[in-house]
A protein has these predicted regions:
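Intrinsic low-complexity, repeat-rich intrinsically disordered segments enriched
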Residues: 1-42
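Surface-exposed, low-hydrophobicity beta-strand/loop segments enriched in small/polar/acidic residues
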Residues: 34-174
């Protein structure tokens, strides 16, 4: 049945009721942005001070509220830390799944996710540091209820502590 209403007047099909499924429709980017359809979400979590001691692991855990794909991971701390190839921090994120038994590495296991002077980078006080995601797409997929372990591992003896570390994760939703 064609819409015979004047322009600007909404047309309502009496056959469409709550719970009706529409198929074959598409949403353009403007419609999606102006709608209430979730396209992504982010979460931040503060951890404990990263100590200077060797072999220390500093873990923070988050539970993912909805299914999605990790699209960005960032770190920020109050203190600066000089890059050093002997005394450095390595950042990692593991998806432990809903049972706690998962092992999927969500960050690349490369020097880019360290504070090494060769391949890594120093930490600037109160600045965001982008972390490099794993190149395997399947490792970035999360389900609602997945538990993620965000870890900062100290190698050597750091020049100073890094206080008020905050981790920010961004996810896209299909």
């Amino acid at each position: 049945m064609p819409n015979t209403k004047p322009v600007g007047v909404a047309y309502s099909d009496p056959e469409l009721t709550s719970g009706t499924t529409m198929t074959g429709g598409t949403l353009d980017s403007t419609t999606r942005v102006n709608s209430n359809i979730q396209t992504g979400f982010s979460m931040s979590q503060q951890g404990a001070t990263i100590a200077t001691t060797t072999g220390g692991t500093n873990d923070v855990f988050v539970v993912v509220p909805a299914a999605g794909v990790l699209s960005a991971a960032r770190f920020s701390g109050v203190d600066a830390l000089t890059a050093n190839d002997t005394n450095f921090i390595t950042f990692s994120i593991a998806n432990l799944g809903t049972t706690g038994a998962g092992t999927a590495a969500m960050l690349a296991a490369t020097d880019a996710n360290t504070t090494k002077s060769t391949g890594g980078a120093a930490l600037t006080a109160n600045a965001l540091r982008s972390l490099t995601l794993n190149g395997t797409a399947a490792n970035l997929v999360v389900a609602a209820g997945d538990r993620l372990r965000i870890r900062a591992t100290v190698s050597g003896t750091l020049a100073n502590t890094v206080t008020f570390p905050v981790y920010s994760l961004t996810f896209t939703v299909a």
